[in-house]
């Protein structure tokens, strides 16, 4: 016997037979071996990036363009890797990448940062957002310079410098410097102010997907392009990150096609 208090098997003339205690011990041992095998499989899966957690941050604006495509494709490809998503303003995304709170981030393009890799996922044009009662809504041939006397609602430059500069440059191309009436760090807030008639705005085209009542969108001549970029730290050691980056790289063409189709409608 293996235990002083329990008989696991009985010896008889015809051989050895398990006792009831022995049968239970066998079942438990088989379960332990199965758990050990599963634990080894889990370790291999995590190490290879097939299982685990990936922390993704993005601007609220990206939730109307890139993030849904990426999230669906990731779910279908890496079902055992949990995607934890968090919305932040662009300046906070960079800090979270550098201190390890995020594994990857999707935001507007920025100047090169040491230790941060980037990949362009989508390029889309700026469009004008006007209150529904704005006089230019009825204009057959909309021109940006017609808004030169309107207050503009835009993001603060310190929050999204590339987007701010693109908006400013678009107005300068049209022959005027915009009157900044109000600044808001979140694109949805910018849109809400437009809907209330506080001012007008230039926004990335995918924000039209917000379908906000009280806002009318107009295309621009020769619009500046805004880039959605995937960013990640070179110091990040999450095994799930390389697969996520490759997945994002593989769906860039789909994102461009989806955006082109929407703009041309």
Regions of interest found by a model, annotated:
Residues 3-6, 25-47:
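Alpha-helical linker/hinge and terminal dimerization helices associated
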Residues 3-18:
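A short LG(V/I)-centered, amphipathic sequence patch enriched
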Residues 116-126, 130-152, 234, 239-242:
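Flexible hinge/capping segments at coil-to-helix
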Residues 114-120, 124-125, 136, 188-235:
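Beta-alpha-beta core module
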Residues 66, 215-260:
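A late-sequence structural motif
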Residues 89-102, 107-108, 157-215:
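Hydrophobic hinge/microswitch elements
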Residues 152-174, 238-243, 252-261:
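Secondary-structure junction motif
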Residues 51-114, 182-184:
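Central regulatory/effector-binding core of bacterial HTH transcription factors
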